[in-house]
């Protein structure tokens, strides 16, 4: 098997039609010797900010001298990004070798595992093989029935900002969504919650109490955000002052506060994480595709906000960083998202839209999205490819700012097309 064949095997397994649950993952991992039983975890769930928070946690733990696994989704440029150890992606040859090990075990099961379940098994094998001290494990979807939830009680469970997303799978209210996320809370294992949504906070507090899990809600009253520039945003939190965070979204200091709170919980459990490591980890964290500046002048931003809750945070960042400016938006949205609310947020900042369809069956066709924008009084033109869309948006932008957003699924293609355009 070569690398391409390994990826084809992983992606060939579709999750549609599978009944959610942990049985398949448990069966698969048992057949592989239960590699996850050798590992310690920080388990991260949430609607938005979970990837950024996970990246910050991993960066700080690495700065403290630990060997750190990081499991995230989706990938931006390359599949291997999803499974990292100390910032290094799993090598192609290791991925192929582990797929060759997982495939016979998966093929022998009567209820075939899903793509995400297979990737979770690959991650656990790699983290065990590389002898990680701790793994920062990002939930795929929800919490309770997510395949990452097979782990024993983690060192800490972290629940980031919650909002309305995946309502078909998780339920129509914030309480339903919080209930799914709170499924990662394990008996006696500490929980850190971003908080701020009373309906959701009540569910998390109740679940933590039922499971005798000590709960810490992030105290955002102790967060002071200073002026940011296009390279970093500077903030103080709970005795850590003047931290320059290279993730420049206005919302990122709040994610950092969540990470700091969780790291201090770990410290109270005996992990050696000095404040100097927290500072160093935050100041060198990298997390592509989240309010990422690809060019300073004229500005070209790439952002992965893919639901109304995330879009609201991105729009606030645009208002903070570029007051009074109109944008050319390069936009792709998944057809199952709240398109109405996302467009309502973007239209006041938009000079012009260029619409494209990300390379996934879930993407709304570019022409349909353009029609929806025009129906609301916006100016929009569809592009037949992402490459054509990037070129057109840059041309329309002139010396003004351009922002590509609406889904993480086109981030890699946008980055590639933009690099090609600027060769």
Give short role names for the model-derived ranges.
Residues 1-48, 52-67, 76-78, 93, ...:
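N-terminal leader/targeting and accessory segments in enzymes
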Residues 18, 22, 26-37, 63-152, ...:
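ATP-dependent carboxylate-amine ligase catalytic core
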Residues 38, 134-137, 145-158, 162-163, ...:
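Nucleotide phosphate-binding/pyrophosphate-handling subdomain across enzymes
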Residues 110, 118, 131-138, 154-239, ...:
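Acidic, Mg2+-coordinating active-site environments of NTP-dependent enzymes
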Residues 127-133, 269, 320-325, 393-401:
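Glycine-rich phosphate-binding loop signature in dinucleotide/nucleotide-binding domains
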Residues 183-191, 321-327, 349-354, 398:
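Short, surface-exposed connector motifs at secondary-structure boundaries
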Residues 194-216, 230-234, 299-302, 308, ...:
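C-terminal helical cap/extension that packs against the catalytic core
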Residues 407:
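Active-site-proximal loop/hinge segments that shape catalytic or ion-binding/gating pockets
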């Amino acid at each position: 098997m070569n690398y391409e064949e390994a990826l084809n095997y992983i992606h060939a397994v579709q999750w549609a039609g599978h009944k959610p649950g942990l049985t398949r993952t448990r069966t698969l991992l048992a057949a592989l010797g239960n590699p996850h039983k050798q590992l310690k975890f920080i388990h991260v769930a949430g609607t938005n900010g979970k990837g950024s928070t996970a990246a910050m946690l991993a960066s700080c733990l690495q700065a403290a001298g630990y060997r750190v696994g990081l499991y995230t989704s989706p990938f931006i440029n390359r599949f291997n990004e999803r499974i990292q150890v100390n910032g290094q992606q799993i090598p192609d040859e290791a991925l192929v070798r582990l797929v060759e090990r997982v495939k016979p075990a998966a093929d022998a099961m009567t209820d075939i595992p899903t793509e995400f379940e297979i990737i979770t098994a690959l991650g656990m094998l790699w983290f065990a093989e590389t002898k990680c001290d701790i793994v920062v494990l990002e939930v795929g979807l929800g919490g309770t029935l997510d395949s990452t939830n097979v782990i024993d009680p983690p060192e800490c469970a972290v629940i980031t900002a919650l909002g309305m997303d995946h309502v078909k799978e998780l339920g129509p209210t914030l309480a339903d969504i919080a209930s799914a996320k709170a499924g990662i809370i394990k008996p006696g294992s500490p929980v850190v919650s971003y908080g701020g949504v009373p309906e959701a906070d009540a569910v998390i507090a109740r679940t933590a109490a039922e499971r005798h899990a000590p709960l810490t809600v992030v105290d955002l009253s102790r967060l002071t955000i200073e002026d940011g520039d296009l390279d970093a945003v500077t903030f103080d939190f709970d005795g850590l002052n003047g931290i320059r965070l290279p993730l420049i979204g206005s919302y990122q200091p709040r994610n950092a506060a969540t990470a700091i709170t969780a790291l201090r919980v770990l410290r109270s459990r005996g992990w050696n994480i000095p404040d100097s490591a927290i500072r160093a980890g935050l100041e060198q964290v990298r997390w592509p595709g989240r309010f990422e500046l690809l060019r300073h002048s004229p500005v070209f931003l790439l952002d992965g906000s893919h639901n109304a809750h995330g879009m609201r945070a991105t729009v606030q960042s645009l208002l903070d960083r570029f007051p009074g400016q109109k944008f050319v938006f390069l936009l792709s949205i998944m057809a199952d998202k709240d398109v109405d609310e996302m467009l309502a947020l973007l239209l006041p900042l938009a000079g012009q839209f260029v619409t494209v369809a990300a390379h996934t069956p879930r993407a709304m066709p570019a022409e349909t999205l353009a029609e929806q924008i025009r129906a609301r009084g916006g100016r929009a033109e569809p592009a037949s490819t992402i490459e054509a869309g990037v070129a057109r948006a840059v041309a329309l932008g002139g010396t003004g700012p351009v922002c590509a957003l609406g889904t993480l699924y086109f981030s890699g293609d946008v980055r590639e097309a933009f690099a090609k355009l600027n060769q």
